[in-house]
């Protein structure tokens, strides 16, 4: 199967602009019904906001933790809706990963984010363009906005937010350029390993 190729097409220090431009690209995408959300939560308040927004969301330690005596993996098993701040703070930072139906929750998720790295992924299929020899590639195509990051795969924290277009595992620079032009942008460097 392999991974998509992810082309960065916008970098900005304004999260709202990144989200808005990603949504403009989504208008060109034959979207799947589900959207992937991920976030690094650094405060108890952020955890509570996300728990209220995404009841039943999957929370886990950002970094692997092991028991100092047994060496076994320590799972995160607190109920984030009932744990007090002190209990939550002992486990921070936490990761949230959730697949949700496309809809209003995605915009609310973007507004509720804190300063940790986060991403929204819209998977789907770019339309076929026979004249340009572009075929949609459903396992690979899509749009991703990464908040506080410049890598399609998790990387270092940055001040900036990056929008990626994902295409076939073989890459499609021509399509990426056309998609970037749709939002008044351009391809900003080499293709990265995508989803």
Predicted features along the sequence, with ranges:
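Structured alpha/beta or helical-core interaction and ligand-binding surfaces enriched in interleaved
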Residues: 1-195
């Amino acid at each position: 199967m392999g991974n998509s190729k992810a082309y960065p097409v916008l970098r900005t220090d304004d999260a709202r602009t990144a989200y808005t431009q990603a949504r403009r690209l989504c208008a060109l995408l034959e979207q799947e019904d589900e959207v992937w959300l991920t976030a690094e939560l650094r405060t108890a308040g952020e955890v509570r906001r996300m728990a209220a927004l995404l009841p039943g969301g999957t929370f886990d330690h950002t970094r692997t933790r092991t028991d100092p005596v047994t060496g076994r993996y320590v799972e995160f098993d607190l109920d984030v809706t009932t744990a007090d701040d002190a209990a939550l703070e002992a486990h921070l930072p936490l990761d949230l990963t959730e697949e949700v139906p496309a809809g209003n929750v995605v915009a609310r998720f973007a507004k509720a984010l804190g300063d940790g790295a986060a991403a929204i992924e819209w998977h789907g299929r770019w339309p076929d363009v026979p004249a340009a020899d572009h075929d949609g590639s459903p396992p690979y195509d899509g749009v991703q906005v990464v908040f506080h990051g410049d890598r399609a795969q998790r990387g270092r924290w940055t001040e900036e937010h990056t929008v990626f277009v994902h295409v076939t595992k073989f890459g499609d620079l021509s399509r990426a350029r056309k998609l970037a032009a749709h939002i008044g942008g351009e391809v900003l460097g080499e293709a990265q390993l995508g989803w």
